[in-house]
């Protein structure tokens, strides 16, 4: 096995490579920025690779939403061209039937997790010339997030992580792909880079 320093360097290098591969596009590229670590990493690395400000997008139900605050801090730091989309309860309720039909489920957690992405992508499709979106999807499943907070051992953590990666296509990837593609946008997921996933 590699030592910790080597592992960290390899994860860094493979993520940077995965992002660089996904920046090649004939169409305009945008970035979903939630303010969380995963999307912030993707945006920061992409901003470093770009010779002009990248275009980032965040969504929230009020201007003082905590996610919008963190996304704005990241956007300011990386000097992106940042757009905040504020949605209302009526926006959510009027889109509920469409999102349920799109996802093919009544699962509350899945619908809740999808609504913001669906409405943000709808905004991007209707109001911008962006055709390709980079996201921070899949990092939670690869690195544990809340799923493994209480794993009794390193072996159990690894077992749960491997299970989540094997079943990835049934959950978040499908949800994100549907919310993005229904709005005529192409999703690109650097954390899903095969070389990166296999190493992690």
Task: Annotate each language-model stretch with its function.
Residues 1-200:
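ATP-dependent adenylate-handling active sites, centered on carboxylate activation for C-N bond formation
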């Amino acid at each position: 096995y590699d030592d910790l320093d080597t592992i960290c360097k390899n994860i860094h290098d493979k993520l940077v490579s995965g992002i660089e591969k996904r920046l090649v596009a004939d169409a305009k590229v945008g970035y979903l920025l939630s303010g969380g670590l995963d999307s912030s990493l993707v945006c920061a690395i992409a901003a470093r690779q770009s010779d002009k400000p990248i275009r980032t997008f965040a969504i929230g139900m009020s201007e003082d939403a905590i996610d919008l605050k963190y996304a704005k801090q990241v956007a300011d730091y990386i000097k992106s061209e940042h757009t905040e989309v504020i949605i209302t309860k009526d926006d959510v309720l009027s889109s509920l039937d469409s999102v349920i039909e799109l996802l093919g489920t009544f699962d509350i957690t899945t619908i809740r997790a999808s609504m913001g992405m669906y409405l943000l992508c709808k905004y991007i499709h209707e109001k911008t010339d962006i055709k390709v979106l980079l996201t921070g999807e899949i990092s939670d499943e690869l690195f544990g997030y809340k799923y493994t907070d209480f794993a009794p051992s390193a072996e159990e953590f690894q077992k749960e992580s491997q299970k989540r990666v094997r079943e990835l296509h049934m959950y978040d990837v499908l949800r994100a792909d549907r919310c993005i593609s229904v709005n005529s946008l192409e999703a690109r997921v650097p954390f899903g880079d095969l070389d990166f996933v296999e190493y992690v």
